[in-house]
Regions:
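A conserved short coil-to-beta-strand element within the FAD-binding core of flavoproteins
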Residues: 101-115
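N-terminal Rossmann-like FAD-binding beta1-loop-alpha1 element of flavoenzymes
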Residues: 2-29
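Short hydrophobic core segments
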Residues: 5-7, 105, 124-132
Length: 132
C-alpha cells in the first residue's frame, strides 16, 4: 500500500512528488505530466513567475541549475515562455525520476483506513492518503 497517491501531474503534483521522494515516502503521481498546460495554455504565453520559482523544494533541480547546464542566463530567458518552462519541467522529471503512472482516476473510494483508487488502464491502487 502506498503512503500517498497524488492525483494530477501538473507543477504542484510534480513538486509534491519530488518532496515526498526526497523524504523517502512511498507514493505515486497519477496523470499525464503537464498535459493540461501543453493542451490548454495559449501559444506564445509567458509565465508571470521568474526563474526564482521552480519545482524543487530541495533547491537541487532549480530553474537556475537548468539554465546553468544550458549555458543560459536569467536575462536571456525572462520572461519565461511556456515552451521553455515545459522544457524545464521535462528536464526536472528526468533528473528526479518521479514515480508517475500515466493514467486517469475513474473511481476513488474512501475505505475504513485507506483509499481505493481505480484507474482507466485497469490498475487498482491503495493509499493511506490522497492529494488532489
Amino acid at each position: 500500500m502506498l503512503h500517498t497517491l497524488i492525483i494530477g501531474a501538473g507543477p504542484f503534483g510534480l513538486t509534491l512528488s519530488a518532496h515526498l521522494k526526497k523524504q523517502e515516502v512511498s507514493h505515486v503521481v497519477v496523470g499525464k505530466p503537464m498535459e493540461f498546460w501543453e493542451k490548454n495554455m495559449p501559444e506564445g504565453m509567458f509565465l508571470r513567475s521568474g526563474c526564482d520559482w521552480h519545482l524543487d523544494v530541495a533547491g537541487e533541480h532549480t530553474m537556475e541549475a537548468f539554465l546553468q547546464e544550458r549555458g543560459l542566463t536569467v536575462a536571456e530567458v525572462e520572461p519565461i515562455a511556456l515552451d521553455f518552462y515545459l522544457e524545464y519541467v521535462r528536464w526536472f522529471m528526468q533528473q528526479t525520476a518521479l514515480p508517475i503512472h500515466q493514467a486517469y482516476v475513474t473511481d476513488l473510494q474512501q475505505k475504513e483506513d485507506y483509499f481505493l483508487v481505480k484507474l482507466n488502464d485497469g490498475s487498482v491502487l491503495e493509499a493511506q492518503h490522497v492529494v488532489v
